[in-house]
Amino acid sequence: MQFVDELISDFDKALRVINGVVFESRPNPGRGLPDGVMSEAEKRHAAGLMRVNNVGEVCAQALYDAQGRFAQKAEIKNAFARAGIEEEDHLAWTAERLRELGSHTSLLNPLWYGGAYVLGSIAARLGDARNLGFVSETERQVEHHLMGHLDKLPAQDNRSRAIVDQMRIDEIEHGQAARDLGAAEMPAPVKGLMKAMAKVMTTVAYRI
């Protein structure tokens, strides 16, 4: 019975995330900031970058849900739950910014979510240390990616920049929390594969 309840809960969460029905526990850091004037090309570029970030948060929801579901220790399950709440903030913030820019979330969100959930399930089955190691490396790569977006976003796009900067701060904390809980270092080939997969996702999500 518990397994069925958990399955229903996960399915409900997936539907909410895919359809953008999410809630923020903290105010959007970009809300209310004055936006500078942007050309249509700059708006499209900013929207593409924020769509990539939104997809990253869709994946984060799936990863953390799966990793927390199949983690072995209660302490680690709770850590994933706490981080997932902050990641849901990011999802809500990026979706709001996309609407402000007159754009939309990725049409492939069901695919992104499903793929990430499978990856998270596999990582969790490898044991808590490797499960946390996957988080640590993911957050390290995401931090690097967000730093790149701060360089690429239009200088006058104050709202997007505020959102991305707070996301970056949160991802650093999530990675450190995973290491504090005993994350194992991921092998170099695995890191390379993760980076390659992220490259495919960011390239496609920028456009679709």
Swiss-Prot record:
Keywords carried by this UniProt record: Cell membrane, Iron, Membrane, Metal-binding, Monooxygenase, Oxidoreductase, Ubiquinone biosynthesis
Catalytic activity, reaction form: a 5-methoxy-2-methyl-3-(all-trans-polyprenyl)benzene-1,4-diol + AH2 + O2 = a 3-demethylubiquinol + A + H2O
The question of whether Iron is a record keyword is answered with: yes
Q: Where does Fe cation 1 bind?
A: E57, E87, H90, E171
Query: How does the UniProt record describe the way this protein sits in the membrane?
Result: Peripheral membrane protein
MF terms from GO for this chain are: 3-demethoxyubiquinol 3-hydroxylase activity; metal ion binding
Which cofactors are named for this entry? Fe cation
Domain of life where this protein originates: Bacteria
EC number(s) from the headed UniProt entry: 1.14.99.60
A Gene Ontology biological process noted in the UniProt record is: ubiquinone biosynthetic process
Task: Classify the main location.
Answer: membrane
Q: What does the UniProt cofactor note say?
A: Binds 2 iron ions per subunit.
A Pfam family assignment: COQ7
Q: Where does Fe cation 2 bind?
A: E87, E139, E171, H174
Where is this chain's protein located in or outside the cell? Cell membrane
| GO terms under cellular component | plasma membrane
Give the family from UniProt. Answer: Belongs to the COQ7 family.
Q: What does this protein do?
A: Catalyzes the hydroxylation of 2-nonaprenyl-3-methyl-6-methoxy-1,4-benzoquinol during ubiquinone biosynthesis.
This one is known as: 3-demethoxyubiquinol 3-hydroxylase
The taxonomy runs:
Bacteria, Pseudomonadati, Pseudomonadota, Betaproteobacteria, Burkholderiales
What gene is this protein a product of? coq7
